[in-house]
């Protein structure tokens, strides 16, 4: 994962790889689950969600990082790419010793209708937005449109109280330098 660069169609001043992105998504997903549990009486397994998030891009080991405009160009491409991702995950799981396949399968193949999946998707969008914030903060205007698009996508997740709380409490701090943090 560390060899797979993200944002392939963008001139990134701070390159990011899939391993770095996955770690940040896991941290954010873990935070969202903890917020749900501590602030809003949730009963989520935050550690399991963090682990699922850590592996959310596993298929990219074989597929690479397909740029978002291509992946979401139309429903037919999106559906076909979902199939490719599943085949890649299945191939990777088949490479494992038999006794590990079920355990890894449970964290790699997350039910797309589950609350956990939604939280990981929200965390994924937040992490991508943070990347855009970082790039635009240092003057890279190439990330401006992606930043606006991701902000709108995050807003659609704000109906979930833990996402709203995370965004209201933490999101603005990602645009600050270390010296600006209080």
Regions found by a protein language model. Give the residues of each.
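Alpha-helical, largely C-terminal catalytic domains
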Residues: 1-182
């Amino acid at each position: 994962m560390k060899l797979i660069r993200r944002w392939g169609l963008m001139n990134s001043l701070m390159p990011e790889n899939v391993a770095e992105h996955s770690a940040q998504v896991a941290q954010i997903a873990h935070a969202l689950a903890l917020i749900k549990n501590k602030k809003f009486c949730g009963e989520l397994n935050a550690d399991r969600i963090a682990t699922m998030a850590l592996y959310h891009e596993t298929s990219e080991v074989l597929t690479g990082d397909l740029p978002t405009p291509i992946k979401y160009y139309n429903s037919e491409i999106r559906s076909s790419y979902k199939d490719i991702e599943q085949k890649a995950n299945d191939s990777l799981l088949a490479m494992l010793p038999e006794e590990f396949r079920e355990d890894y399968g449970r964290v790699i193949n997350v039910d797309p209708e589950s609350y956990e999946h939604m939280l990981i998707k929200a965390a994924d969008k937040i992490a991508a937005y943070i990347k855009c914030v970082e790039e635009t903060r240092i003057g890279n205007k190439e990330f401006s449109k992606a930043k606006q698009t991701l902000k709108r996508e995050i807003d659609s997740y704000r109906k979930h109280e833990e996402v709203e709380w995370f965004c209201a409490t933490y999101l603005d701090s990602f645009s600050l330098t270390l010296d600006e943090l209080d």
